[in-house]
Amino acid sequence: EKKSKMRSQQLFNAVYKKNIKSFDELTTFGIELKSKIKNLISLDKPKIVDIQKSKDGTIKFLLELKDKRNVETVLIPDKTQSRYTICLSVSVGCYLSCEFCATAQISKKLVRNLSPGEIISQVILCKDYINDWSTNKQITNQVYMGEGSPFLNLDNVKIAIENSKNKDGLEYGRTRITVSTVGIGIKKDNIDAIEWAANALDVYLAWSLHSSISNHRSELMPINDKYSINSLIPQLKKYYEKTKLPIF
């Protein structure tokens, strides 16, 4: 067990810190072990189909996944153009149909959720693009505000965040990651999902409110008809009580 833990730490370090491109680079691993790892884990990243750059330095990537589905990832720079926030997608398509959302203009249905690897590989791909590994440019923050709703893919988002926070991995602090929610009051393991997320994710939470007037919010976000502002506030309070992190 101790040796397995050590090997796991070495593997995480190699993938997330040393940025290995092939498992053959695991020089301290035997041939048999490397063969097992190759059968279990892939280092493949999404294919970059298109890149758009704005005047302020924001970079939008159109990515192609293994099944030829597309998602978008965005890098948002600070004023120095050296520190970036990455906006991550968690699914292909989304059925929530929020009026202001670009995804809703493309797809009115959830095609499929992204795996933990597909989520975290967006970070690795963008780190490669700006050469985060060896220059003064860094992706310092993650926001789960791209395509799809994180609360409709909680299990995979949880694993991706755990890998991001792992000290042998990308080593992001809890205040460097923000998960957005439109306010989905579903149950998860017999408790409210927002309360579940407080324990399981333990990161900043951003509530996509857009209007405090219920009727107006329903026009913008149909999900408000099912999970109203008033029904969500107690859950959000519990999130704050457990994490002591402000909700945006």
Give each language-model segment a name.
Residues 1-84:
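Flexible, acidic/Gly-rich N-terminal and inter-domain linker regions that tether
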Residues 127-248:
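Conserved AdoMet/S-adenosylmethionine-binding subsite of the radical SAM
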Residues 60-62, 87, 204-206:
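Beta-strand secondary-structure signal
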Residues 78-125:
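Canonical Radical SAM [4Fe-4S] cluster-binding loop centered on the CxxxCxxC motif
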Residues 54, 89-90, 180, 208:
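Short linear Ser/Thr-Pro motifs
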Residues 18, 103-108, 212-214:
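A short, flexible beta-alpha/helix-coil linker loop
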Residues 21, 96, 214:
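Glycine-centered loop/turn positions within well-structured domains
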